[in-house]
């Protein structure tokens, strides 16, 4: 099985239900089978084309979701297959000056799940540990 269903924002104001590849995880990522996903106000703004200049289409939205880990990369230490998780949608590097001061929202390479990266309006989602 290497395909999944996802709600893909193909153009602003248009979402298509598509069969897409299940994300492949890297050594420090986990694969989550999404169990629950919520629609947030920012999802609505992205749908309408009003929200974020970094968003590019096509995009799988959804930054508020939870599920169960079904696969882990070989360097993942804090999670195991079967763990139930809710995802922090902010992905920071942990290495830049802002991150070293624990000011993660100012990370120089900050990415937001469902905004910069595909999100949880899908059957599976990958995120870094």
Task: Tell what function each PLM region has.
Residues 13-17, 41-42:
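Short N-terminal binding/cap micro-motifs at the start of the first secondary-structure element
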Residues 23-37, 50-97:
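Glycine-rich beta-strand-centered segment in the early N-terminal region that forms part
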Residues 93-129:
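NAD(P)H dinucleotide-binding glycine-rich loop of Rossmann-like/cofactor-binding domains
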Residues 44, 89, 111:
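Short secondary-structure boundary segments
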Residues 42-48:
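Cytochrome P450 core scaffold surrounding the K-helix E-X-X-R motif
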Residues 2-5:
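Extreme N-terminal starter segment of soluble prokaryotic enzymes
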Residues 19-21, 126:
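Generic structural detector for well-ordered beta-strands
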């Amino acid at each position: 099985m290497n395909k999944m269903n996802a709600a893909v924002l193909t153009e602003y104001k248009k979402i298509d239900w598509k069969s897409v590849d299940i994300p492949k995880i890297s050594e420090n990522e986990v694969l989550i089978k999404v169990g629950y996903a919520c629609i947030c106000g920012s999802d609505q703004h992205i749908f309408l084309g009003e929200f974020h200049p970094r968003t590019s289409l096509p995009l799988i939205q959804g930054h508020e979701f939870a599920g169960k880990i079904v696969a882990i990369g070989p360097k993942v230490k804090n999670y195991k297959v079967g763990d139930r998780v809710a995802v922090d949608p902010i992905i920071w590097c942990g290495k830049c000056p802002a991150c070293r001061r624990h000011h993660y929202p100012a990370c120089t390479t900050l990415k937001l799940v469902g905004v910069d990266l595909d999100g949880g309006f899908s059957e599976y989602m990958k995120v870094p540990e």
